[in-house]
């Protein structure tokens, strides 16, 4: 893709997200979401092959359906309230349709089927954008409409997403699919706490984006896409191996790493709201994610797969300029637990 075209596409995608973040008008929110959707499709098709085209088509059909449901809900709300403001979402039908549309855009269960397939069919850099930046706009709409969302609709979606995110990643060998199922589980945690403390959802989103970005950067550096290629990382770049180990355990939520913070705070927040069964189910289900990340860690660091790679080990990075962000991102992704007391301002 030529640099001027790529620049225009990226600016359109960023502009769409900014429009959604700064708007309280339903029509402009819908326009921003459409800009976001249309801009990423050429990025998903950057590598011209049948898998990328199939992934782009699946993404387009799913997101177009979600946009249609969202516009229908907005129109019904306009018919009843006569206003476009997001704060005037009073109709239960509108609330249900908006929640369903946002769940489709985020990949929440039972609308999650497109996330692993689309992520697997794209390049690692495109998958990074899909699993991080593309979550910001729908979650911001969810943040704005959280007072009017029906808990009986959103909470079952959130719990099911955590279950699917754990079960789906158990038998996977493709790293992009594993990260996609991990994304589904993280979206479930975020949407569960949105109803009770939307600000905590923003904290969870920030930590999730940082951890996922760092993981994708390391995978792109090694051109790692499968568990087999991940198991040979020690042979190509020994310095990368412990970083990947720490990041995967952090994504799984193992204390005392950074990924444990949002899970801990979300369970605490739900318990404060006199909910016992739901956070218990969420905590137990989170062990599924931790299990398949620990299995990856075991295959990467504690076993030696048969390898024909005779190249010399890389004890330093080839291009330091490309990896300049890796050190701060790795520190934030693994060592945020000591600052947890400062996060009491979210209560």
From Swiss-Prot:
Annotated InterPro entries: Complex_I_Subunit_2, NADH_DH_su2_C, NADH_UbQ_OxRdtase_chain2, ND/Mrp_TM
Topology within the bilayer: Multi-pass membrane protein
EC number from the UniProt entry: 7.1.1.2
Range of residues in the leader sequence: none
A GO molecular-function annotation: NADH dehydrogenase (ubiquinone) activity
Pfam families: NADH_dehy_S2_C, Proton_antipo_M
GO cellular component: mitochondrial inner membrane
Catalytic reaction annotation: a ubiquinone + NADH + 5 H(+)(in) = a ubiquinol + NAD(+) + 4 H(+)(out)
Predominant place of localization: mitochondrion
Membrane-crossing segments per the record: 3-23, 25-45, 60-80, 96-116, 149-169, 178-198, 200-220, 237-257, 274-294, 323-343
Domain of life from the UniProt record: Eukaryota
Subcellular location: Mitochondrion inner membrane
Keywords: Electron transport, Membrane, Mitochondrion, Mitochondrion inner membrane, NAD, Respiratory chain, Translocase, Transmembrane, Transmembrane helix, Transport, Ubiquinone
Transport as UniProt keyword: yes
Keyword match Cytoplasm: no
GO biological processes: mitochondrial electron transport, NADH to ubiquinone; mitochondrial respiratory chain complex I assembly
Disulfide bridges in this chain: none
Entry's family note: Belongs to the complex I subunit 2 family.
Subunit and interaction comment: Core subunit of respiratory chain NADH dehydrogenase (Complex I) which is composed of 45 different subunits. Interacts with TMEM242.
Functional summary from the UniProt entry: Core subunit of the mitochondrial membrane respiratory chain NADH dehydrogenase (Complex I) which catalyzes electron transfer from NADH through the respiratory chain, using ubiquinone as an electron acceptor. Essential for the catalytic activity and assembly of complex I.
Protein name: NADH-ubiquinone oxidoreductase chain 2
Organism: Mungos mungo
């Amino acid at each position: 893709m030529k640099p001027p075209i790529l620049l225009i596409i990226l600016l359109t995608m960023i502009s769409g997200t900014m429009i959604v973040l700064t708007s309280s008008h339903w029509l402009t929110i819908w326009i921003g979401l459409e800009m976001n959707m249309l801009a990423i499709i050429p990025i998903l098709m950057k590598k011209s092959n049948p898998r990328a085209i199939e992934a782009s088509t699946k993404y387009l059909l799913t997101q177009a359906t979600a946009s249609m449901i969202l516009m229908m809900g907005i129109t019904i709300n306009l018919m009843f309230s006569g206003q476009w403001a997001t704060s005037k979402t009073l109709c239960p039908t509108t609330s249900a349709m908006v929640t369903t549309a946002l769940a489709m855009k985020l990949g929440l269960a039972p609308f999650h089927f497109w996330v692993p397939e689309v992520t697997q069919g794209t390049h690692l850099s495109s998958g990074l954008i899909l699993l991080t930046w593309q979550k910001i706009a729908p979650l911001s709409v969810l943040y704005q409409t959280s007072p009017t969302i029906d808990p009986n609709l959103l909470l079952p979606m959130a719990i099911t997403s955590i279950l699917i995110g754990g079960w789906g990643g158990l038998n996977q060998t493709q790293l992009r699919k594993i990260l996609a199922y991990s994304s589904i589980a993280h979206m479930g945690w975020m949407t569960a706490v949105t109803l009770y403390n939307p600000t905590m959802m923003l904290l969870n989103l920030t930590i999730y984006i940082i951890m996922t970005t760092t993981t994708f950067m390391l995978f792109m550096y090694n051109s790692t896409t499968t568990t087999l290629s991940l198991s040979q990382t020690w042979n190509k770049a020994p310095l990368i191996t412990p970083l990947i180990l720490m990041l995967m355990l952090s994504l799984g939520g193992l204390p005392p790493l950074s990924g444990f913070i949002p899970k801990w705070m979300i369970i605490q927040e739900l318990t404060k709201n006199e909910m016992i069964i739901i956070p218990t189910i969420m905590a137990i289900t989170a062990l599924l994610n931790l299990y398949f990340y620990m299995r990856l860690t075991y295959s990467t660091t504690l076993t030696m797969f048969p390898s024909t790679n005779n190249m010399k080990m890389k004890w330093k990075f080839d291009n330091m300029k490309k990896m300049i962000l890796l050190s701060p991102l790795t520190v934030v992704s693994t060592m945020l637990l000591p600052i947890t007391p400062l996060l009491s301002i979210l209560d």
